[in-house]
């Protein structure tokens, strides 16, 4: 039987590096560096060099961060659990917390909105960035899904601007218009008791009502 010692040594390091880059993609550089108690400069160097220190390989810190996303600690006193998608700075969340809800997962891609959100809410779970990259296994079970998905592809002003620029709108806008289908993907996988989708008035009449019909049928 042959034994490749160097390969065995590489495998744990590779696994940890893959975990590190996955978290970097999920929650961003600033949050990850803060959670690891290192500078963003150090984090960039680890990723650039594809190398992380021995103590990180032997420790469980990366697994703990994944755990805080998928299974955050919750209060015994909350009436229900909800997730906050396309969260902005947390305006919708405020109302549902006021009636006893507890937020167990947050997604917001804009780093400036993230910064304000984190100042508004001291959570035990990090904010996930691009929801399109999130496997539903990483989303905790919840009773209610909140999603204020982008309105620009559907609003009167947004559609008018895109038309003037010769750009697609509605579901044809592949940067923002298709994000509803990520909401659908999560609802299908997690089966919350209820969901609330917030958008503009024109959503119901966009594309002669066909857009809203697709949403209702989904």
Predicted regions and their residues:
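Conserved active-site and SAM-binding loop architecture
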Residues: 1-218
């Amino acid at each position: 039987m042959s034994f490749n010692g160097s390969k065995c040594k590489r495998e744990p390091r590779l696994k940890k590096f893959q975990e590190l880059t996955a978290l970097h993609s999920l929650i961003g550089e600033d949050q990850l560096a803060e959670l690891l108690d290192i500078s963003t400069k150090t984090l960039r160097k680890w990723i650039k060099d594809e190398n992380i220190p021995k103590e990180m390989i032997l420790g469980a810190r990366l697994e703990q961060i994944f755990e805080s996303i998928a299974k955050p600690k919750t209060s015994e006193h909350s009436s229900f659990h909800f997730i906050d998608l396309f969260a902005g700075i947390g305006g919708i969340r405020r109302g549902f917390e006021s009636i006893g809800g507890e937020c167990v997962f947050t997604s917001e891609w804009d780093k400036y909105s993230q910064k304000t959100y984190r100042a508004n809410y001291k959570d035990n779970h990090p904010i996930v960035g691009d929801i399109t990259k999130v496997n539903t296994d990483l989303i905790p079970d919840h009773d209610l899904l909140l999603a204020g998905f982008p309105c620009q592809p559907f609003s009167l002003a947004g559609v008018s601007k895109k038309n003037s620029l010769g750009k697609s709108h509605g579901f044809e806008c592949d940067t923002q218009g298709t994000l509803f289908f990520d909401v659908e993907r999560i609802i299908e996988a997690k089966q919350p008791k209820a969901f609330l989708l917030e958008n503009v008035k024109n959503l119901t009449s966009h594309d002669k009502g066909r857009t809203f019909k697709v949403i209702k049928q989904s």
